[in-house]
């Protein structure tokens, strides 16, 4: 993958999922996630400053000395927000690069600010619905993402048309993604 991308490591996968409870007990409503994805694309991706860090700092500011990657594209496929991420040649980016080269499975997690509202699910368990004031700050690489299936996979920047399934570019991971989505939906 690195050789095919002019020496750049590019990874793709699920960034976030709408209307599904994550491992932190939060649900991101579709309308809020769509709004923030659009704002993030306009304010950060198009300006080539959609930077993120390793791990998941509590800060509402991306610390440049810890930057490891840049989001280059994101789009919705159903309720999944998918994205393309370029790993940078920074000290933290080099750690990511080596982890990927060694076959380590890495996840990604959104960082944001805003309120949450406690609501009750049909089974009586509480869930935290992300409020309308939510603001997306960044996507950070983590070892254990809160969004089910939010893992990144090294892929060639040039999409192999034989790997496109129903307009999706998940390549050989389409089957895995379908299985994960069926489990999440309870099918």
Regions from the PLM with identified roles:
Residues 1-46, 166-175, 185-186:
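Polar/acidic, low-complexity leader/linker segments enriched in S/T/G and N/D
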Residues 176-180:
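Short amphipathic alpha-helical segments that mediate assembly, nucleic-acid/protein binding
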Residues 23-25, 63, 93-97:
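A short, polar/proline- and glycine-enriched secondary-structure boundary/capping micro-motif
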Residues 40-62, 108:
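Short conserved beta-strand and strand-loop elements enriched in small hydrophobics
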Residues 10-13, 50-51, 70-173:
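Residue microenvironments linked to proteolytic maturation
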Residues 21-22, 59-62, 69-71, 117-119:
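Flexible loop/turn segments at secondary-structure boundaries
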Residues 15-19, 54-58, 87:
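Short glycine-rich, polar/acidic loop-and-turn segments at beta strand-coil junctions
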Residues 27, 60-61, 126-127:
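Short, solvent-exposed loop/turn motifs
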């Amino acid at each position: 993958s690195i050789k095919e991308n002019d020496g750049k490591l590019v990874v793709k996968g699920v960034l976030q999922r709408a209307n599904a409870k994550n491992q932190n007990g939060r649900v991101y409503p579709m309308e809020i996630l769509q709004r923030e994805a659009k704002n993030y694309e306009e304010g950060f991706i198009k300006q080539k400053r959609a930077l993120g860090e390793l791990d998941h700092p509590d800060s509402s500011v991306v610390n440049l000395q810890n930057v490891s990657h840049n989001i280059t594209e994101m789009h919705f496929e159903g309720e999944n927000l998918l994205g393309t991420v370029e790993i940078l040649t920074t000290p933290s980016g080099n750690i990511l690069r080596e982890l990927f080269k060694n076959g380590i499975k890495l996840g990604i997690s959104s960082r944001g600010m805003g309120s949450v509202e406690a609501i009750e699910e049909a089974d009586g368990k509480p869930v935290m619905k992300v409020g309308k004031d939510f603001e997306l700050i960044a996507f950070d690489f983590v070892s254990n993402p809160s969004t089910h299936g939010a893992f990144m996979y090294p892929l060639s920047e040039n999409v192999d048309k034989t790997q496109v399934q129903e307009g999706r570019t998940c390549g050989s991971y389409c089957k895995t993604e379908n299985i994960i989505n069926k489990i999440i939906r309870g099918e």
